[in-house]
Amino acid sequence: MTGAFRSSGKAARFADLVESVQHCDLCPRLCARRKVLSGANGNVESKVLFVAEAPGRLGADRTGVPLYGDRTGDNFEALLGNVNWHREQVFVTNAILCNPQDDHGNNRTPTSEEIANCSAYLEMVINLVEPAIVVTLGATALSAVAHIWPHGLELREDAAKVIPWGTAKLMPLYHPGPRATIHRSLIKQRSDFTRLAQLVHPASGLLQRKPKPAVTLPPIHAIPGGASVAEEPR
């Protein structure tokens, strides 16, 4: 995976945004946690931007890489691979950039206040990347982007529907976490990703070809905590 940029101007703006995020203290319960925004999020020149819910305790909060290092990440990697995509071709972020935990240290759903607090950062990320299509993963992410531009979509009724949204298109999909696969199986999610891939077929020029990596993800075994782990369901 790479955080390489083609535009030095965009690279500088992204670096400034990452620096700003690291100093955020808007959410008292989260401000001490890792802020998951860096070159490891993907390619800021991509035309495809995924928005998930939040860094998982055993995934991005541990690895620093969105949707990576736990069962949710494994599912996401498989969905990308099913359409012959690579992380180097897309950008991945979350509705909130810190891992929300309950009093027992387990993942919890972000509060509406936390989502609102982080919406400005989400908007800045989207504006910087300038994707042709924003793909939300799960109901929380779909709700979060409505803070930026209203859309009127509901995940259960509108999954895989594509609508104009701001200067981009919006496509709501289910989250690849273990719990979400109860409501929409991985088989169905593979079909959703196939539809997405058809929308951004290389011939359309929307999705970049895989560039030469400048930054490589560490092997899972090199990350504190060991091998890919089974995250508690979201």
Explain the meaning of each model-derived region.
Residues 2-157, 162-202, 206-207, 218:
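A polyanion-binding, active-site-adjacent surface
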Residues 20-23, 209-213, 232-233:
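Intrinsic disorder/low-complexity segments enriched in polar/small residues
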Residues 210-224:
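A short, charged, Gly/Pro-tolerant segment at domain boundaries
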Residues 220-234:
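Long, low-complexity, intrinsically disordered segments
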